[in-house]
Curated annotation (Swiss-Prot):
Pfam families: TPR_1, TPR_16, TPR_19, TPR_8. The modification Phosphoserine is found at residue 174. GO terms for molecular function: mitochondrion targeting sequence binding; protein-transporting ATPase activity. The keyword Membrane applies. It is found in: Mitochondrion outer membrane. Present with 45300 molecules/cell in log phase SD medium. Coiled coil: none annotated. Changing residue 277 to H: In strain: YJM1129. This is Mitochondrial import receptor subunit TOM70. One of its GO terms (biological process) is protein targeting to mitochondrion.
Length: 617
């Protein structure tokens, strides 16, 4: 599998608009420099590799010969150590000469693994002359004795004197990684690449490793309910995300909510409604808001279902044999359960829906429980709950539709097609089976059939934005971008004509994403406007935010990009999605730090200017 950096070079930090605006980041500049320097082999030499992996590397200037027999050229006290009592009278030339001799003496001790003595002589050399090599050698000594803090301290002093000291940058990066200061390590590695000292193959694995560690650390810091240090990608993708204790969990985007509940036939009433009962009124209010398709209605429904469940439980405690109360409580718990599931609380969802089934089994309760099982990757239980739902109502189209979805995911295409056909037969006014059948045909490489099925759906549902929106996704996958843009425009137009949310911001995000594939100035501006509009219309959409963050990054609005990436992490459903957003944010922070350094920022502009001159940009 490709590394995160390799996969996301463009998405993270790598695009330059046609105006030539610089989008600064280590990997992008490095990538362009590789084009400039094709064939040039700037790899880490053996000594440098040894320095990062083997503490016994020789310091700079060390000789292979044995210690010289001649007496030292610098003044010596009676104990054999340097005598600086007359240092004030040393000439500049003498200071340089003595310092070099002391450094050479330190090298002899280093070569003989007498690191404490080597450290003393390097420090004495520094008393006479501040030299980056002396600090570098000191840092190498501290590598050998395992004092990583001192490695960083001495490396920093060397870099203050010689900012482009490649060997020391690499050494400090390694030490910072060992100290858990991954962001600092990333910065040094980025500077190394920007300097063009090493090629992409040399630096990228180290940067990738530190970026992963930094992102994992931030993930654990913010959400802390998975062992991120040892988690595999599969564990991250299946681990339900638990928000911070100080932050209330929210519902997903209203676009997602409308899409999810749009599959079900609206249930706007229930048996034995008593308008004098506050619990009944809350349940009725919840059902009414659930199908209003407005931005605020889902939060209102959530609140009402929660209140209704609490009130019905109180009433049932006083009269636990009342079957009517049991049914009403079951309906309430069914809905609090699915809302908890959508808010990333699968355990709470399972508990509520299980209790609802025990009180009064309903088709939707079984469907929701099946979805919880699917979220756990338990396909066996998933199908079992659908079987139970069909025993209650063998003609419920939603059961067949959701079972078809699972078969589609598992690539059981024949069975998926049968389920979608049945759902379509049972509820011909539900648009989603039509769309899924068209998507299924495309998945089976039958584009003509796919197009025919979309045409059928369009004839039956001429005002439905779902048809052009999903067809645009298919056309995008087919690389038919011009037609896809037209379909997205049609979907946006149809959505705007309707009361309520149907496809929501999906066509706005889809069109923006498509525009960025042809990165002209005009397309970037339009894509940014579309994503800003999408984020305002649906503030809980992580897709809109992460897309907008990438645009802000490319426009050098790094602060805003970081904020949006971090907000995306809060909104994302799974740990894997959260990790990706955090990784983007941490990569952007490195870019921010590089560009805030005047020397590095100047170097970035110089590098890009050269590339423009050569026609590489």
């Amino acid at each position: 599998m490709k590394s995160f950096i390799t996969r996301n070079k463009t998405a993270i930090l790598a695009t330059v608009a046609a105006t030539g605006t610089a989008i600064g980041a280590y990997y992008y500049y490095n990538q362009l420099q590789q084009q400039q320097q094709r064939g040039k082999k700037n790899t880490i030499n053996k000594d440098e590799k040894k320095d990062t992996k083997d503490s016994q590397k020789e310091t700079e200037g060390a000789k292979k010969s044995t210690a010289p027999s001649n007496p030292p050229i610098y003044p010596v006290s009676s104990n054999g150590e340097p005598d600086f009592s007359n240092k004030a009278n040393f000439t500049a030339e003498e200071k340089d000469k003595y310092a070099l001799a002391l450094k050479d003496k330190g090298n002899q001790f280093f070569r003989n693994k007498k690191y404490d003595d080597a450290i003393k002589y390097y420090n004495w050399a520094l008393e006479l002359k501040e030299d980056p090599v002396f600090y570098s050698n000191l840092s190498a000594c501290y590598v050998s004795v395992g004092d990583l803090k001192k490695v960083v301290e001495m490396s920093t002093k060397a870099l203050e004197l010689k900012p482009d000291y490649s060997k020391v940058l690499l050494r400090r990066a390694s030490a910072n990684e060992g100290l858990g200061k991954f962001a600092d390590a990333m910065f040094d590695l980025s500077v190394l690449s920007l300097n063009g000292d090493f090629n992409d193959a040399s630096i990228e694995p180290m940067l990738e490793r530190n970026l992963n560690k930094q992102a994992m650390s931030k993930l654990k810091e913010k959400f802390g309910d998975i062992d991120t240090a040892t988690a595999t990608p599969t564990e991250l993708s299946t681990q339900p995300a638990k928000e911070r204790k100080d932050k209330q969990e929210n519902l997903p985007s209203v676009t997602s909510m409308a899409s999810f509940f749009g599959i079900f036939k609206p249930e706007l009433t229930f048996a034995n409604y008593d308008e004098s009962n506050e619990a009944d009124k809350e349940l009725m209010n919840g059902l009414s808001n659930l199908y209003k398709r407005s931005p605020e209605s889902y939060d209102k429904a959530d609140e009402s279902f929660t209140k209704a469940a609490r009130l019905f439980e109180e009433q049932l405690d006083k009269n636990n044999e009342d079957e009517k109360l049991k049914e009403k409580l079951a309906i309430s718990l069914e809905h609090t359960g699915i809302f908890k599931f959508l808010k990333n609380d699968p355990l709470g969802a399972h508990e509520d829906i299980k209790k609802a089934i025990e009180l009064f089994p309903r088709v939707n309760s079984y469907i929701y429980m099946a979805l919880i099982m699917a979220d756990r990757n338990d396909s066996t239980e998933y199908y079992n709950y659908f079987d139970k739902a069909l025993k209650l109502d063998s003609n419920n189209s939603s059961v067949y539709y959701h079972r078809g979805q699972m078969n589609f995911i598992l690539q059981n295409y024949d069975q998926a097609g049968k389920d979608f056909d049945k759902a379509k037969e049972l509820d011909p006014e539900n648009i989603f089976p039509y769309i899924q059948l068209a998507c299924l045909a495309y998945r089976e490489n039958k584009f003509d059939d796919c197009e025919t099925l979309f045409s059928e759906a369009k004839r039956k549902f001429p005002e439905a934005p779902e048809v052009p929106n999903f067809f645009a996704e298919i056309l995008t996958d087919k690389n038919d971008f011009d037609k896809a843009l037209k379909q997205y425009d049609l979907a946006i137009e149809l959505e705007n004509k309707l009361d309520g949310i149907y496809v929501g911001i999906a066509p706005l995000v889809g069109k923006a994403t498509l525009l960025t594939r042809n990165p002209t100035v005009e397309n970037f501006i339009e894509a940014t406007n579309l994503l800003e509009k999408a984020s305002k219309l649906d503030p809980r959409s992580e897709q809109a935010k992460i897309g907008l963050a990438q645009m802000k990054l490319q426009q050098e609005d790094i602060d805003e990009a970081i904020t949006l990436f971090e907000e995306s992490a809060d909104l994302a459903r799974t740990m894997e999605e959260k990790l990706q957003a955090i990784t983007f944010a941490e990569a952007a922070k490195v870019q921010q730090r590089i560009r805030s350094d005047p020397v590095l920022a100047k170097k970035i502009q110089e590098t890009l200017a050269k590339l423009r001159e050569q026609g590489l940009m």
